[in-house]
């Protein structure tokens, strides 16, 4: 995934994870929590680091639903890669990512963290400049370059079960 110095790919990764698991209308939330009601929560985040990124997908569900949840996640990730993504889905994700960046800059700590990182790595840019990359991401580009990297065969799975679980 995206390295910190590749803001275009960072924004694309943020768009992809938002499309999949941010808000009630995102694909995974809609299917697993709203339609099937087999998860309590589902979240997908990208953590950007200097040499690359880590995408974490977390689903909280009853233990007896784990296999079904895993199967539906796999199905939805594959579907996102090959089925048409509607323009309104992409626009919604672009709005959420853009608003998230804008609102994060309201906190002085966030501004200091961004400015400090930029200064440390010698990559100064305007705080809102990552927004310019959002519009360069099309459905086709997401499906060709990022969504293949979010497939189950590219991932590791960790199950955290209660101690008294069998």
Features from the language model and the residues they span:
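Buried hydrophobic packing residues in well-ordered domains
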Residues: 14-16, 32, 57, 73, ...
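Short beta-strand-to-loop capping motifs
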Residues: 1-2, 59-61, 161
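C-terminal regions of mature proteins
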Residues: 93-166
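Glycine-rich, charged/polar anion/phosphate-binding loops
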Residues: 2, 40-46, 141-144
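Short, conserved charged micro-motifs
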Residues: 7-9, 64-69, 166
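His/Glu-based metal-binding/catalytic segments typifying zinc-dependent metallopeptidases
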Residues: 1-25, 118
């Amino acid at each position: 995934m995206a390295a910190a110095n590749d803001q275009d790919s960072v924004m694309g990764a943020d768009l992809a994870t938002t499309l999949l698991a941010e808000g009630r209308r995102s694909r995974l939330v809609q299917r697993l929590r709203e339609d099937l009601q087999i998860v309590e929560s589902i979240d997908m985040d990208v953590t950007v680091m200097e040499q690359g990124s880590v995408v974490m997908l977390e689903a909280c569900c009853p233990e007896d639903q784990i296999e079904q949840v895993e199967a539906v996640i796999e199905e939805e990730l594959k579907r996102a890669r090959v089925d048409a993504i509607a323009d309104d889905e992409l626009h919604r994700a672009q709005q959420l990512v853009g608003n998230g960046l804008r609102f994060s800059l309201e906190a002085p700590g966030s501004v200091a963290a961004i400015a400090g990182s930029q200064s440390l790595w010698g990559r100064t840019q305007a705080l809102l400049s990552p927004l310019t990359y959002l519009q360069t991401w099309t459905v086709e580009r997401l499906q060709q370059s990022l969504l293949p990297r979010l497939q189950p065969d590219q991932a590791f799975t960790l199950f955290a079960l209660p101690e008294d679980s069998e």
